[in-house]
Amino acid sequence: MNEIREAAVQTPEQATAVIRAEALAKTYAEGKMRTPVFDGLDLSVATGETVAIVGASGAGKSTLLHLLGGLDIPTSGEVYVAGERMSALSDAQRGKLRNQALGFVYQFHHLLPEFTALENVMMPVLLSGKDVAVAKGQALQLLESVGLGHRVEHKPSELSGGERQRCAVARALVNKPGCVLGDEPTGNLDDKTAGTVFELMLELNRAQRTSLVLVTHDRGLARRLDRVLELNQGKLRELAPSAV
């Protein structure tokens, strides 16, 4: 992908950013109706940094996360992932970059029900072109690190809610991405299990230097991240610790 990388000189902050958004805008259109979500939004996430995005329901938090992950296309502006300008990539190239550079964890685990925990976690490695033995080795290592080494042959229906979400975290991290994007990753769990999964994500962040960008309604969890950004009326602003 080097041939499509920007030729422009980057600032030190830009060069070390795992994800960067510049003048990002998104407007949904239906017939003659236009619904702007945000306009002129800037964001930079450094290697190993943890960022929480908070805001009211309907503020556009999930939309922003989808744009950062290349799952949606901005109306204008640019998103850079691992130094690559997403708008310059084909659909196939974007998919490959997502698989290699990003991990995704959602409120609902989205594990494939017909496959075991091991097979679910192996999937991103296989999609990156590595052979089965390598994929199995990486998946087993991650499942062990999230406390599921004894559950690798169980299907999602045989796992508890917390175990399914831990499996989803392992799947997100198995390719050692630069950044994990989480959309309410603990929102469907009870408080105790949510705390366990959140601690796990922070431990893996420290161990692998993987950046985290988490959309959450839980201000208590948000306060434990490096930065808290509030999306309100299309604007993104950093909150002081006392305001979170």
Curated annotation (Swiss-Prot):
- UniProt xrefs under Gene3D superfamilies: P-loop containing nucleotide triphosphate hydrolases (3.40.50.300)
Single Gene Ontology MF annotation: transmembrane transporter activity
User: Single GO cellular component annotation?
Assistant: plasma membrane
Location within or outside the cell: Cell inner membrane
SUPFAM superfamilies reported for this sequence: P-loop containing nucleoside triphosphate hydrolases (SSF52540)
Question: SMART domains, per this entry?
Answer: AAA
Membrane topology summary: Peripheral membrane protein
- List UniProt keywords, sorted A-Z: ATP-binding, Cell inner membrane, Cell membrane, Membrane, Nucleotide-binding, Translocase, Transport
> Is Transport found in the keyword set?
yes
**Record-linked InterPro entries:** AAA+_ATPase, ABC_transporter-like_ATP-bd, ABC_transpr_LolD-like, LolD_lipo_ATP-bd, MacB-like_ATP-bd, P-loop_NTPase
* Superkingdom of origin: Bacteria
Give the ABC transporter domain ranges: 19-244
Cite the binding residues for ATP: 55-62
Q: What is its EC number?
A: 7.6.2.-
Q: What is its main location?
A: membrane
One of the GO biological process terms: lipoprotein localization to outer membrane
The EC class name is translocase
Assembly, per entry: The complex is composed of two ATP-binding proteins (LolD) and two transmembrane proteins (LolC and LolE).
Summarizing the function annotation, the protein's role is: Part of the ABC transporter complex LolCDE involved in the translocation of mature outer membrane-directed lipoproteins, from the inner membrane to the periplasmic chaperone, LolA. Responsible for the formation of the LolA-lipoprotein complex in an ATP-dependent manner.
So what family is this one in?
A: Belongs to the ABC transporter superfamily. Lipoprotein translocase (TC 3.A.1.125) family.
NCBIfam families per the record?
A: LolD_lipo_ex (TIGR02211)
Descriptive protein name: Lipoprotein-releasing system ATP-binding protein LolD
The uppermost taxa in this organism's lineage are:
Bacteria, Pseudomonadati, Pseudomonadota, Gammaproteobacteria, Lysobacterales
